[in-house]
Every structure is written in structure tokens, then in C-alpha cells.
Amino acid sequence: MRRSEGFLKTMEYYNKAKTQEFIERTLKADVSESRDKFIDYVLKNSRKEVPSKDLNILDAGCGSGRDTKVFLEKGFSVAAFDASNALCIAASEYTGIEVECSTFMETDYENEFDGIWASASLLHVEKEKLIDTVTHLKKALKKNGIFYASFKKGDFSGIREGRFFQDATKEYLKELFGEKCEMEILELYEDESLLSNGSIQEWVNVIAKKN
């Protein structure tokens, strides 16, 4: 399969140039509010009060393994993958589970997961490929499964700071997950994070359900 320039640059960044810097930065990032929202929806739709091993979470583009580890510690069964070899190795060591080295489209799951967590990962997929990518990942969800994704807020598409980014707006995510990928939008919201350089990064988040 021919890889795009954006994909190759992004993998070079994660595999060679900034691996350790990225890991250290993301391990410090606090996404607990969105993660807790996601967990609440997974439990509600599974009619469970607490996490258990019979609830399966897929961490799609797990990066450092930060959230995979939290899901495991809370009691979920978790599968995780990332396209970066270096991050897969680091995340496997950090989480204690084997992290699969795979792109979104190379995964081969069907009706296996109660939730998919794609925190700041789908933002590396070109806009023209997002419908196919989300539709492919959606197949991994059980009926009524929950899908979370986050993107940097905006309309930018291209190489930024050595990686490809596809930014998004609430309107676009509503169209992508709701109209194009035929999921039920449960929440669509914006939040902010403080970057290491002291600046503020705005994010858009979507939580959707497979019907």
C-alpha cells in the first residue's frame, strides 16, 4: 500500500525524531474528564455499574499507552494498537499488554468492543479518508457500542510541527459521525488543554453510539 507524504512524515516524527519527548508530554496530559464521560457511557449502555473484564475497550491509536493503562487499572479488558513501531514498544512496556502495530485500516475486528477510544489519533488521517476510516473502525463495535474521538479545533489540514494534522469543527464531526457514518451523536463538545509552552490548545470531542 502506498503511504501518503503526511503519513510518512508523521511516522518519522513518532519513530525517530520526537518519540521520547512525545511520550513524556502525553503522559502528563490530563484527559480524565473526557475519559470519565466515555466510561460512563460504556457502562450505561452495557447496563453495568462498574468496569469488568467482560467489557472490552479498543484504544485506537494508543500512543504512549496512557489511557490503555487507566482502562486496565479500572478493570476493563483492553486491546490497543498504534501505527508507530516505537510507540507500540513503549506502550507495551508501560501497560504490560502487547500493543499491536497497525494502522486504523489494517485492523480486523468485528462486533468485539463495547467502546472505542480514539483520543487525538484520528486527527492524523486525511479528511478524504476519514469516512472510510471511521466506518471501518465502527465495525469493531458491538451494537450500542460507544465511539469517542478528539481533534484539534479548526480547519487546518497539512503538515504542522513535523506531523500531518486534520483539524475539525463541531459541525464537521456531527456530519462525519452522524450523517456520513450513521452513528447516534451522544455528546459533541469543546475543551482546552495547557501545552508545555504555556499556550492553550482548543479541542473538539465527539461521543457517538453504534445503532
Where are these regions (language model features)?
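Active-site charged/polar residues at nucleotide-handling catalytic sites that mediate phosphoryl
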Residues: 111
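Conserved acidic residues
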Residues: 114
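Short catalytic micro-motifs in class I SAM-dependent methyltransferases
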Residues: 120-124
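A conserved beta-strand element that flanks and buttresses the S-adenosyl-L-methionine
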Residues: 117
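Class I (Rossmann-like) S-adenosyl-L-methionine-dependent methyltransferase catalytic domain
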Residues: 1-108, 125-132, 136, 146-211
